């Protein structure tokens, strides 16, 4: 089977929000559509040239997220005939989407594909497991889907504990971690101040009582960290 060369011709992303921050009321499908639409526009190609759309997503936040890729494709202007599918590889979901999009081109399924990912942990739902058929007797339990996904399904271990285990195994002290974290915050703040990310970011429109505002700068960076 012949494998064709694949090239990245355009990229786009939204600014990153903090947990429970400016993007907490913005649907995940809107975030995905915003990025996909901008990436297509920046490529100089028409939306009907896109032959495949692949989106990574870990935490569905709305019924539309079950077909996030297709919602983003259609709302970004792609024809209804354009194939689309979601992938879930946890933290690597967006990267896997890019790989899958590249494979679609490489093996001749299409000439143009869009690959990316969209996540809104702020909008992660709670599950009421007894709601459909009733609790019948005793207490009912509400499950934090977002927090649950951060746990290993076999050991029931939070991924934060994995970091503690790695630190212990490789003798990484708290001081070393703090130094790296502080330097990371400093670099991110400096990059934002210098405008290094502006060309990457496409603004997200947020409807407020005072009108529409544009969210276009990464929010979580703590510039004052020392």
Which residues fall in each region the model found?
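Beta-strand segments within the central parallel beta-sheet cores of soluble alpha/beta enzyme folds
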Residues: 48-56, 83-88, 113-118, 178-183, ...
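Active-site-proximal alpha-helical scaffold in enzymes
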Residues: 89-119, 167-196
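Conserved active-site "lid/cap" helical segment
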Residues: 1-58, 62-72, 76, 83, ...
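Acidic, glycine-rich active-site loops and adjacent beta-strand->loop/helix elements
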Residues: 12-15, 56-60, 89-93, 117-122, ...
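Flexible glycine-/small-residue-enriched beta->alpha junction loops
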Residues: 111-166
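Conserved catalytic cysteine-centered active-site region
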Residues: 57-112, 153-161, 224-226
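N-terminal extracellular/periplasmic Venus flytrap/periplasmic-binding protein-like
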Residues: 7, 13-14, 24-29, 33-34, ...
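Short coil/turn connectors at secondary-structure junctions
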Residues: 2-5, 47-51, 78-83, 93, ...
